[in-house]
Amino acid sequence: DCTGHGVPGGFMSMLGVSMLNDMATADSIQSPSLMLQSLRHNIVTALGQTSFDEDNHDGMDIALCTFDTKSGILNYAGANLPIIINSKSEIPPSDRIQPYQDGLYELKPDRMPVALYDKMDSFSEIRIKLSPGDAVYLFTDGYVDQFGGPKSKKFGHDAFRALISSVKNLSFSEQKQIIWSTIERWKGETENQTDDILVMGLKLPGK
């Protein structure tokens, strides 16, 4: 999810996708956190960023995962974007793993973008084991930040988690229909779509 609109945002998206594709095909970096650090270095270099400027928001928010099909291990690193896991197995909670009802967990990101920032810490990584039938949801902030409803407010993270919880046992085609119709009803006839919206679900084969 790149900052900026129009040409600047589109350029940043193309740059990020190209760099991630190069890293994935090179097969030299397997760790999502190291990939984000490499991506940040490459973007800062490509944009010629030399100092942090609060008025310059060129950068990228991203949730990046790798999955080992043999071990069932998911590795996640995030720059401002969390992910949601629906798991039949209990995942131990931590300061970065927040459990919710009915097997839903939110994996929290590092609070910094892929860009030159006032905090340039290393990206951290969460490693969990998934089970057959578990699902992973990745999403940009366009859905939760969409204005609408009777009070013209943001949809919000709590409502989004509740929505995922309510549809998680349905087929993905049914989930897609409900998730889309929900935000359309929320937006109504008076609100414009405020940002790009992406919600992506991945389910492990099995029970």
For the regions a protein language model found, what residue spans apply to each?
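Phosphate-binding active sites in nucleotide-utilizing proteins
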Residues: G4
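Active-site-proximal, acidic helix/loop segment immediately C-terminal to a metal-coordinating Asp/Glu
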Residues: V7-S28, S124, L130-T190
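DG-centered beta-turn motif at the end of beta-strands
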Residues: D1, L81, T140-G142, D196
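Intrinsically disordered or compositionally simple regulatory linkers and C-terminal tails
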Residues: K203-K207
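Short gly/ser/thr-rich secondary-structure transition/capping motifs
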Residues: H57, L116-S122, S181
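Cytochrome P450 core scaffold surrounding the K-helix E-X-X-R motif
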Residues: I85-I91, D118, F147-K153
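Catalytic core of PPM/PP2C metal-dependent serine/threonine phosphatase domains
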Residues: V7-K88, F123, G188-T194, L202
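Short, basic, low-complexity termini and linkers enriched in Ser/Thr/Gly/Pro
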Residues: S87-L104
